[in-house]
Amino acid sequence: MANSKSAKKRATQAERRRQHNASRRSMMRTYMKKTIAAIEAGDKEAATAALAIATPLLDRMATKGLIHKNKAARHKARFTAAIKAL
């Protein structure tokens, strides 16, 4: 456990960031699942709408450092290709 005042503060801040990041990661996964569900259902309009919400969200998470930028690009490319194939 942290002994110094600064170490205690860092531990508190790290826990706060962990909870914040967990919330953001959960939100990101939820929107990705909505996009996947629309694609699997074969609903092109719903999939396009879900992708329109998920794309800037993935970009934002990559910018914030929550996920790697290549992971965001990979998901966007795969979702777009899957929607075009519908």
Swiss-Prot record:
Q: Which region is the signal sequence?
A: none
For bias type Basic residues, the affected ranges are: 1-27
**GO CC aspect terms:** cytosol; small ribosomal subunit
Q: Which GO terms describe its molecular function?
A: small ribosomal subunit rRNA binding; structural constituent of ribosome
Q: Name one Pfam family in it.
A: Ribosomal_S20p
User: Which UniProt keywords are given for this protein, alphabetically ordered?
Assistant: Ribonucleoprotein, Ribosomal protein, RNA-binding, rRNA-binding
Any one Gene Ontology BP term:
translation
- Its transmembrane ranges are none
According to the UniProt record, where is the region Disordered?
1-28
Which PANTHER family does the record match to this protein? 30S RIBOSOMAL PROTEIN S20 (PTHR33398), SMALL RIBOSOMAL SUBUNIT PROTEIN BS20C (PTHR33398:SF1)
Family, according to the entry, reads as follows:
Belongs to the bacterial ribosomal protein bS20 family.
Sum up the protein's function in the record's words: Binds directly to 16S ribosomal RNA.
This chain belongs to the protein called Small ribosomal subunit protein bS20
